[in-house]
Amino acid sequence: MKKFLNSKWILLILPLSVLIISLGVLISMQGIFFFHPNNDISSYNELKKDNNYEEVEIKTSKGKTIYGWLKRNKQSSSSPTVIFFLGNAENSSSVVRNFRDSGKINYFDNFNLLIMDYPGYGKTKGFVDNDKTFLNFGTEIYDWAEKQEFVDKNNILVMGYSIGTCAATYVASVRDVTGLVLVAPYDEALSLYNDKINVFHGPIKLLTKFKLEAKKYAPNVDVPVLIFASKADEVINYNFSENLSHYFNNIDEFITLENIKHSYYFNQYEVWDRIQNYLYYRINNWLKKKSYYNNIAIIFIVVVTNLMFVDALLAGKDYLEVH
C-alpha cells in the first residue's frame, strides 16, 4: 500500500515539476523569446561604401548610442520621413541592403527612410530588458528625427513590423505622426505567450516580463491606420492582428493576405503598392489641410484689409464734410 502511494505521488509530482521547470525556463528566457539580437557585418560594410545611405548615431537621453541607417531624399532640403521599426530577428543593415538590392527602396522616393537597431542589434549596445526600454527606444528616435533640418517635422510617419508594431503604435499615440502602418501586428505580449504555452491565465500571467500592450496605446492614435495581416502567418496569429484593429478609432484599411508566411510580407508587391499609396495619401491630405488653412488665413487678411480701407475712406469723407 505504501509503495502504491509513493508511486501515486510520483505520478502527481512529476508532471507538476516538469511544468514548473518549463515555466522557470520560459520566464528566465523571455528576452530571447521576444528579441533575437543579431548583426550583419557584410551588409554593414556594403552600405558603408554606398553614398546613398548614411550611418546614423543617435545619443539618447540616458547617454547611450543607437545606431542605424538613413536613406535621405536628396531632392529636397526637407522631406517627409518614415521611421521603420523592425521585426525581432532583423537588423538595420540587412533590411536596408535588402531594400536596396531588390529595388524596393524606390517605394520611398521623395521620403527619408530611417531604420535604427534595437539594443543588442547591429552596433547598438545593451539589450531590451523591459517594456520601458523598448518604448523609449521609439520616442528617442522620433525626437531625434524631429530636430533634423532635412526632416519635415509636420510629416513624420511610422511603420512597424511584427515585434516592432508595439513601438510604432506607442510612438503614434504619444507623438504627432502623419501616418501609421502596421505589418503582422499583435494586440499584446500575453497573446504571444499563450500562443506558445497556453498557461498564462489568472495569477500566472503576472509572471510575464513583457506586456507590449499595443492595444492599450491604439485608442490614442489619431491618424488612420493601415494594417496588413495574413491568415497563413505562423508567428503572429491572424486573430491577434484582427483584435488589435478593433482598438483603433480610425482604420484606413485592414488588408487580409492569403497564403503569406511571416517572413514574406515584404516580398509582395501588393503590400508595397498599398504602403506607397497610403504614404502619399497621408502627405497629400496634410498638404490639403495646410492649403485650406492658408486659404482661410489669406481670406481673413483680405477681408480685414478691405475693412480697414473702407474705414479709412469713410474717415476721409467725414473729415471733408466737417471742413
PLM segments and residue spans:
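Membrane-embedded segments
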Residues: 61, 65-144
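Hydrolase active-site cap/lid region
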Residues: 165-220, 264-267
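Short beta-strand/loop motif that positions the catalytic acidic residue
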Residues: 221-222, 226-229, 233
